[in-house]
Structures are given as C-alpha cells and as structure tokens.
A protein has these predicted regions:
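Short, flexible helix-loop junctions that flank or precede catalytic/ligand sites
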Residues: 1-376
Length: 376
C-alpha cells in the first residue's frame, strides 16, 4: 500500500488541477494507460503525452485520501470526497476501480458564480427567481449547465431579496456567500447523513427558498411538492432532455393509483420547467446555452392536470408573449444572432425538419448567406 501522504504524487496532481482551473476546465481525469486529461468546453484535452500507470493512479489516489477513505475505497472500490487547493478551488472527487485499476474524476466546484447576464438566460428567469412560492425545476443532461444556471438564479435572489435560502446537495456544486440573504448549504454525507433526513428537517429551519440538488426518486419529488404547497419556493434539478421528458419522468416516479393526484398537485404548484443544452459557439469560442422555458398558465395547468403532456409543446410555441420558448425557437434565435452554426442548430433540434423549414422561410441570416449556406 502506498503512503497516503506521498508528496510527489499530490504536488503533481495539484499542478494539474491548477492548470485545469487556469483554462476553465470542468473535470480532470486520472486513469490507467492514458495521460492525465481535462475537459474544456465539453472536449477532452490531454495534459501530457505520457500515459499513467496503474501504480501511479493508485499513488495519486492514496495521496489525497484519509485513512478512513483508503479503508472505504479498499473495501468497496468506490469513494466520494472533496479536496481543496489554497486560493484556488474545491473539487469533488470520485475514486473508482475500472478494469482492476484505480481511476479518479475531479469536478471543479467554484465560488465564482457566473452572473445571470453572462449565461444567455431568458430575462423571464429573473422574475421566476423572485417568486414567493411554487416549484421551479431545471432540466438537462449531465454537463448541460443546469447547475450553473440554477446557481446563478440563487445568486440573483441572494442579491435582490432578504430571505433564508437552504440548499441540499450531493455534492455542493457552488459556494454561495451571504449577501442580502442567509444561505445555508448542506452536503449529503458531510453536513447531514442522507436525503430523507435532510429533507424531513428542512421546514424546521425556517426557509423561504429550498434548493434540492437533484430529484432522483418519488420520495424527493414528494418533498419538493410539499415544500411548494406550504408556501415556499422550491428549486431543483432533474435529469431529462426536455420539459416534456421531465414531466414524463416525474409521472413515472409514481404508481398508477397516485398519478391523478400528482398531476393535480403539479398543475397547482408548478412555476416553471427550464431545460437547457450547451451548444458550441460558431468559430470554437466556447459554448452557449439554448434554453427552453415552460411557464405555468391556466391552459398549461389544465393540460398537466389531464396528463396531456404531448400537447404542451404546441401550446408553448403559441405562448412566446408570456416568456415561454421551445428548444427549437431558442436554437433559431441563437443561429439568427450568429452565436451558433446552421449545422449545430439542426443537429440539436427537437425537430430538425421544422427548424430547417423555419430557417428557410424566416431567417435573414440564411437569406444573406445565399447559396453559400448548405441547408442540409
């Protein structure tokens, strides 16, 4: 067994982490037979040409683990924890075994929360962030930026209201500072034993806003609805690719006999579903968010109550004046403004045919491009 305090391995790792922060990377990967690598703008970039050996990967892992963590890793082949670099950042660490060898993934947890205006978020979200009660769910796949957008909304609320905001996360993604609000951040496994205990005790802590890091099951969804029903603003994230898919996933959390009541509760308490994807900027200048917004309204509430999820998208298209926007409408705007290429717009569309037709018929940018634009 390697010495858990091996200085050489730790110093080398810290240098890679600082390099990743310098170039605004999101993740660092340590795995056997591949050089250390970081992910920047969704793409893997190698930090050296020399592949890491299995022994080196284990040495790096043990250099940052406590004795208790080494014991846990040795018995389960898994360990989750966090480390900090002085004057740099915190990192969430997942240590695992793959093909019999140690591997690690480091996720940067930053205290520098992007301002609302820098994220290309629809202005209606500022209004949503200041609502008194209800349920706001951010939707997206892994790496879609939903946690960053949600953190930005919490920060906006922090600056523009005088509340107690409680976040329950696994792990904490962004470090919030107290501004006009008191921010209480609780990490599962560190500040509280588990999700059920944390959620059960939340209302005893006099919150105004409750952030649930991720809704993964029926019990957590029940708590989210309960928080909204009792007069709190509950914000959460959910893994899904669109608002329609998110609604379907929530419905499928529950057995058939509970679904009618669930749909009624959602129709009464939902404020918004916000779904986003990160699209490469044209010219390789990073990525930009395409954001879909579903707001509750009498018509939307009626569709949800009836379980007519398939009709919601069409109603969103007709409700842009309220602040609603579909993914394809967001992609059209990004293309028209010169933020993304035609190819990336079509590739990410929910309906490539409809978006292609919309660009052909309405887009001034496409008309100006003339025959140079290949309308595939």
């Amino acid at each position: 067994m390697f010495d858990e305090n091996t200085p050489g391995a730790k110093e080398e790792l810290f240098a890679w982490l600082r390099h990743m922060n310098k170039y605004k990377g999101s993740d660092l990967f340590i795995t056997t037979n591949f050089p250390p690598a970081m992910k920047v703008d969704g793409k893997i970039t190698r930090l050296s040409d020399e592949p890491l050996s299995a022994e080196k990967c284990m040495e790096i892992a043990f250099s940052i683990m406590s004795s208790k963590q080494i014991e846990e890793f040795s018995s389960t082949n898994e360990c989750n924890f966090a480390i900090s670099l002085p004057d740099t950042s915190r990192f969430r660490v997942n240590a695992m075994v793959q093909r019999g060898a140690t591997a690690l993934v480091f996720r940067s947890i930053t205290g520098n929360i992007p301002k609302f205006e820098t994220l290309n978020l629809p202005p209606i979200l500022k209004d949503i962030a200041l609502r008194k009660r209800g349920l706001v769910i951010f939707v997206g796949g892994t790496g879609s930026g939903k946690s960053t957008s949600l953190a930005s909304l919490i920060d906006y609320r922090n600056e523009n209201s005088f509340d107690h905001i409680i976040t329950i996360e696994d792990p904490i993604e962004f470090i919030h500072q107290h501004k006009n609000c008191i921010i209480t951040q609780r990490e599962i496994g560190v500040d509280t034993e588990n999700w059920p205990i944390a959620l059960k005790n939340t209302l005893r802590q006099a919150p105004d806003v409750i952030l649930i890091g991720e809704i993964r099951d029926r019990e957590t969804m029940d708590y989210a609805i309960s928080f909204a029903e009792t007069g709190h603003l509950c914000m959460a994230t959910l893994h899904a690719n669109s608002t329609n898919q998110a609604l379907d996933r929530i419905i499928n959390f529950f057995p058939e006999e509970r679904r009618n009541q669930l749909l009624t509760d959602l129709s009464l308490n939902l404020q918004a579903f916000i779904s986003q994807r990160l699209i490469p900027r044209e010219g390789g200048r990073g990525r930009v968010a395409a954001v879909e917004v579903l707001l509750n309204s009498p018509i939307i509430a009626d569709l949800i109550r009836k379980g007519e999820v398939h009709n919601i998208k069409e109603m969103m298209k007709k409700s842009t004046g309220m602040g609603m926007i579909t993914f394809d409408q967001a992609l059209y705007d990004l293309y028209e403004n010169g933020d993304i290429s035609y190819q990336d717009a079509i590739k990410n569309a929910d309906s490539a045919h409809d978006l292609r037709l919309d660009i052909q018929l309405r887009s001034r940018r496409a008309q100006n491009a003339g025959p140079d634009l290949e309308l595939i």
